[in-house]
Amino acid sequence: MSNRAVAVLRGDPGVTGTVWFSQDKESDPCVIKGEIKGLTPGLHGFHVHQYGDSTNGCTSAGPHFNPFNKTHGGPKDDVRHVGDLGNVEAGADGVAHFEIKDHLVKIHGEHTVVGRSLVVHAGTDDLGKGVGEKKEESLKTGNRGARVACGVIATAAPQ
């Protein structure tokens, strides 16, 4: 069994990226490390979505991966979707470099993210903290905007 997975992201013109997942055993946190180019400067919602389906672009990826039927939240919240990874930040050059350690994301076991999609969004994820008119959507999606790139998370070759 491989302890690595990879997603190659494609989407809007010029938006590309590679994201690596590593996890030695199911009880360990998953390390998610990558680079995404071609983004507008600032924060971008970043999520694992339910389906590894790209037949209609990133729309086919479905909703956030949520096997425990929770509301949307931030990556450090107790109540959140498994797929809620928060935001990645692109610098003035449009490149986001990041490393995330997450205790809910798994590349082994019953609730693996392998075979699902990784999606980067146009806008900032509000981490389920939206108020007023935005509260209902905040608890589902984080009001993160359109999907600008996605890729299927696949088992990676051993190093």
UniProtKB/Swiss-Prot annotation:
Cu cation binds at H47, H49, H64, H121. It is an enzyme of class 1 (oxidoreductase). Disulfide bonds join C58-C150. Its main location: cytoplasm. Binds 1 copper ion per subunit. Its EC number is 1.15.1.1. The keyword Flavoprotein does not apply. GO terms for cellular component: cytoplasm. Its cofactor is Cu cation; Zn(2+). The keyword Protein biosynthesis does not apply. One of its GO terms (molecular function) is copper ion binding. It comes from the Eukaryota. Zn(2+) binds at H64, H72, H81, D84. It is found in: Cytoplasm. It catalyses: 2 superoxide + 2 H(+) = H2O2 + O2. Keywords: Antioxidant, Copper, Cytoplasm, Disulfide bond, Metal-binding, Oxidoreductase, Zinc. Pfam families: Sod_Cu. Belongs to the Cu-Zn superoxide dismutase family. PANTHER family: SUPEROXIDE DISMUTASE CU-ZN -RELATED (PTHR10003). Destroys radicals which are normally produced within the cells and which are toxic to biological systems. This is Superoxide dismutase [Cu-Zn]. It comes from Haemonchus contortus (Barber pole worm). The lineage of its organism: Eukaryota, Metazoa, Ecdysozoa, Nematoda, Chromadorea. The gene is SOD.
